[in-house]
Amino acid sequence: GFAVEVVHRPGNGDWTSAVQEAIARPGAPVSLASISSVHWADGGAIDIASIAPALRAKGAALLVDATHGAGVTPIDVKTLDPDFLIFPTYKWVLGPYGRAFMYIAKRRQEGVPLEQTGFGRRAIASEAAPYLKDTNFAPTARRFDMGERDHFISLEMAAVGMEMLAEWGAGAISARLGVLTDRLAEGLASESL
């Protein structure tokens, strides 16, 4: 069995310390930590780079939900070394709904996918005979591909959005958002909200 532990919003707003305290707590070991790089409710940034080593020291897997950060904050999977990193394209990546991406570290690519598809198998192809030539899972992260992944219009839309972001740069986008947020904070400081 397993238990799900939720880290509740800390009174001081320091999500990183709250997550680190939860990891260090005595009790059942953490097996998998699913952590958003930017909290969805309050926009609080979570320093995944400082949390990852603590999880590795405990032998826990790290899944980074980059939904609210991909495209705005730089993410280097080589340095961060998460087991999994996921994000949809409909937020900051400027893509359509229904399209998402998942990075899977090589050490985790032998896992069993939740969705059992022909795309995730070694050799299942409607144009080939025999159709079910090799039903073993693909030896790479391709085994985790979704069914109906070849929706060409949404793939093109996602690609264009990512090309635009690559041209602008996550650092420049983040800096611009910082300027706008500071301006908003200054304007609201005089209001009685």
Task: Show where each model-derived region lies.
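Pyridoxal 5′-phosphate
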Residues: G1-L193
